[in-house]
Amino acid sequence: MDFGDEPEGSDSQRRRKRYHRHTPRQIQQLEAMFKECPHPDENQRAQLSRELGLEPRQIKFWFQNRRTQMKAQHERADNCFLRAENDKIRCENIAIREALKNVICPTCGGPPVGEDYFDEQKLRMENARLKEELDRVSNLTSKYLGRPFTQLPPATPPMTVSSLDLSVGGMGGPSLDLDLLSGGSSGIPFQLPAPVSDMERPMMAEMATRAMDELIRLAQAGDHIWSKSPGGGVSGGDARETLNVDTYDSIFSKPGGSYRAPSINVEGSRESGLVLMSAVALADVFMDTNKWMEFFPSIVSKAHTIDVLVNGMGGRSESLILMYEELHIMTPAVPTREVNFVRYCRQIEQGLWAIADVSVDLQRDAHFGAPPPRSRRLPSGCLIADMANGYSKVTWVEHMEVEEKSPINVLYRDLVLSGAAFGAHRWLAALQRACERYASLVALGVPHHIAGVTPEGKRSMMKLSQRMVNSFCSSLGASQMHQWTTLSGSNEVSVRVTMHRSTDPGQPNGVVLSAATSIWLPVPCDHVFAFVRDENTRSQWDVLSHGNQVQEVSRIPNGSNPGNCISLLRGLNASQNSMLILQESCTDASGSLVVYSPIDIPAANVVMSGEDPSSIPLLPSGFTILPDGRPGSAAGASTSSAGPLAAARGGGGGGAGGGSVVTVAFQILVSSLPSSKLNAESVATVNGLITTTVEQIKAALNCSAHGHHP
């Protein structure tokens, strides 16, 4: 038995020795030796073993472990140092980028040569190379065809190169491939920028906070910053407020902000008015891009949420999002404004909200050859205060820098340069009209004079008409992804066309050809609006009605102005009994809109019964009517006579004086096969359709000698 106990005790003793901790004296001497010699030889380890009472093997392992520990400590320290240096360099890089934006050349006092200059040089070289290649291919084609090969003129916009002269005289020519007239909606799909990095988030949050503070100061500032200019606003005042740029620069001074290139135009405006919606509901509209586009189809042609930076707890308060937006004035004659910006929503106190916008430069876009932004939104937004009876008081501030790289179309030059095209009064007027329409949509009852329409049918009809208006407005954009071709011809009417493959369930499937032209008329906006929306005068301009009268079957009002309504029209001709026309007319202090689309009777019955109208295909056409913005006219940059006071009188947008800029737009289904070709005859047909419509409108309004086209 003793024989078995002894090995057990010796094993336990070895285990205790294996995990034996060194004494403080042993550790002190080992550390001292390690400082002198981290790699002791065998003799040194033997001497330490005798002095400390440890085995040589223990000495060897201790030094190995100590060297490994020191190496790990050094690596951690180096990593921390390199990480700090990396963060420091990145911050310095960002600061240098910001400084370069505002640096001033000491010689000429202007900005230095930027990356866009070198990008322009590269593009010129690439264009020269492509021109040589085109000339070479043209020569080869001429030899093959045995006749000269005609090219389009150099001024033809990009992505619209074609060997076919799209003129009225081009009837019976060869078919035109679909890709040669490329619309934006079915071309290259829109690519959102990448989400915000962790490095960018705090910077954007700081920018949004500063923008919010500046917005509140601007919204509450007095006459020292805001000056009154003639024209009136949506609230019925005698003048509208524009920003005094010099005073603004002195108060909100920014590095290099005193210098602006001659091509940069500053637009600043402020407007206040009552809106039929609560402050909380308005904040939700502003922070939801889908609702944002639905409320402002006449201004916002496209909007996307790139990233949600801060998701407010318990509502929209303290929410921060990064947005992309395209702004337009519903004509292909003026390019859209494309803006990346952060939107900050904050509840300041009970019943008072603030929405602040400010542009951000997404530097990562520059690596993919994206052009520098032409539009830059400075701190803008609105203050929203709850009032009685479901109303809110909105103070809107719009502040933007725009670089005009190409001449503005002569018809819209006064309207754009005055700041009225995208000013605060236009935003607020559109918001007031949209809120009235929404209140009519959610109202439970139906006016007693609307016979045969149920509340469900009314809502269904309003939703269908809203989709029609949104589709029409978005089809008029002129962005990089949605470009138009100007038709050549001897006629004075300059028609722009584009086409796309339609696969949207809300549109007919196939090839859709869109055409539009803009004209100036020496007639007040409200007169033009009343003429084109009235079913009694429709036969005077509607070519497709062949001079036959139309009758209004039903009308649904959607605002306090009688001009804001939805109508179902029916032709009195026996051949038109199977089709109806859905029409919505909209007007506010900034302009007017008349949109219509054919709809068959079975589809109309589906809508009137209250069923879902989302699958009913529509191909809308219509008119946009804007004041010409000429100085001194009552229909200038903003118009007071068509505000809420004029609404009771039934006046349209633009007031009772001055001229109008009218855009006429048609969409036609060329073929129900998406892969089909477009024949020049189809282009000539729509060209003739627009030309005839324009001439008939001018004749009916007694201004045949005054029409002017871009």
Swiss-Prot record:
GO MF terms, alphabetically ordered: DNA binding; DNA-binding transcription factor activity, RNA polymerase II-specific; lipid binding
Annotated Basic residues bias: 14-23
Cellular localization per UniProt: Nucleus
Region (Disordered): 1-23, 630-650
DNA-binding region boundaries: 15-74
Keyword Transmembrane among record annotations: no
This protein's GO CC annotations: nucleus
Occurrences of domain START (ranges): 197-440
Function of the molecule: Probable transcription factor.
Protein name listed in UniProt: Homeobox-leucine zipper protein ROC8
Organism: Oryza sativa subsp. japonica
Gene: ROC8
